[in-house]
């Protein structure tokens, strides 16, 4: 099984890259975010690889990090989610944002993925909510905030700040994560305006 490839970028296709490794061109399918982050043809690149072997074909999937590859595997443990859908999800949400979306039970964020309807998004959030911490990609502050929101215990300033950031165009997971960090910095008595200001600062990093 191929676990990693290091070579020279030969060319790009719609959803794949041809990686030249010592004269052999490997066609590696990647999420759009991964393809966008790779260098120009002629430059060196390294990809973590997931190898799929079928009766009629061998298919390679490439990732910039091992964490991204682990998410690819984890997503496919969900009913109705195959390799194509898993790549689409990772094209829409990077691992950290996906982890936060699941922790916050934000089905809408996952459902923004092309080809993922409300039912599949709900399955992803429901079936993976207990597995997310194992990947250590989710912010503990977001998990705590998620529980507070679910139990209607979150301060009004926190929920108002999240709504304000969402209205500014940020996704729910990003907004919640930023406000969670802001709340941890400013303290439990922070006002909405302060949380928004600190949240925007966090989002600009």
From Swiss-Prot:
The keyword Cytoplasm applies. Belongs to the RuvA family. One of its GO terms (cellular component) is Holliday junction resolvase complex. Its main location: cytoplasm. Has three domains with a flexible linker between the domains II and III and assumes an 'L' shape. Domain III is highly mobile and contacts RuvB. It holds the Pfam family HHH_5. Residues 144-154 are annotated as: Flexible linker. Residues 65-143 are annotated as: Domain II. This is Holliday junction branch migration complex subunit RuvA. Keywords: Cytoplasm, DNA damage, DNA recombination, DNA repair, DNA-binding. Residues 154-205 are annotated as: Domain III. GO terms for molecular function: ATP binding; four-way junction DNA binding; four-way junction helicase activity. One of its GO terms (biological process) is DNA repair. It comes from Rhodopseudomonas palustris (strain TIE-1). The keyword DNA-binding applies. The RuvA-RuvB-RuvC complex processes Holliday junction (HJ) DNA during genetic recombination and DNA repair, while the RuvA-RuvB complex plays an important role in the rescue of blocked DNA replication forks via replication fork reversal (RFR). RuvA specifically binds to HJ cruciform DNA, conferring on it an open structure. The RuvB hexamer acts as an ATP-dependent pump, pulling dsDNA into and through the RuvAB complex. HJ branch migration allows RuvC to scan DNA until it finds its consensus sequence, where it cleaves and resolves the cruciform DNA. Homotetramer. Forms an RuvA(8)-RuvB(12)-Holliday junction (HJ) complex. HJ DNA is sandwiched between 2 RuvA tetramers; dsDNA enters through RuvA and exits via RuvB. An RuvB hexamer assembles on each DNA strand where it exits the tetramer. Each RuvB hexamer is contacted by two RuvA subunits (via domain III) on 2 adjacent RuvB subunits; this complex drives branch migration. In the full resolvosome a probable DNA-RuvA(4)-RuvB(12)-RuvC(2) complex forms which resolves the HJ.
């Amino acid at each position: 099984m191929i676990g990693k490839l290091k070579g020279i970028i030969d060319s790009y296709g719609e959803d794949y890259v041809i990686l030249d490794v010592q004269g052999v061109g490997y066609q590696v399918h990647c999420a759009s975010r991964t393809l966008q982050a790779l260098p120009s043809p002629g430059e060196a690149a390294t990809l973590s690889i997931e190898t799929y072997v079928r009766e009629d074909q061998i298919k390679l999937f490439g990732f910039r990090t091992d964490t991204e590859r682990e998410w690819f595997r984890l997503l496919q443990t969900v009913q109705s989610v195959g390799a194509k859908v898993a790549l689409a999800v990772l094209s829409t949400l990077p691992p950290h944002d996906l982890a936060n979306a699941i922790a916050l039970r934000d089905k809408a964020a996952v459902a923004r993925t092309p080809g993922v309807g409300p039912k599949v998004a709900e399955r992803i959030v429901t079936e993976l909510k207990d597995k997310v911490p194992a990947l250590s990609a989710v912010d503990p502050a977001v998990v705590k905030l998620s529980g507070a929101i679910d139990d209607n215990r979150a301060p009004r300033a926190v929920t108002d700040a999240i709504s304000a950031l969402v209205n500014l165009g940020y996704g729910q997971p990003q907004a919640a994560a930023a406000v969670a960090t802001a709340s941890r910095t400013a303290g439990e008595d922070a006002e909405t305006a302060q949380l928004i200001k600190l949240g925007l600062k966090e989002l600009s990093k």
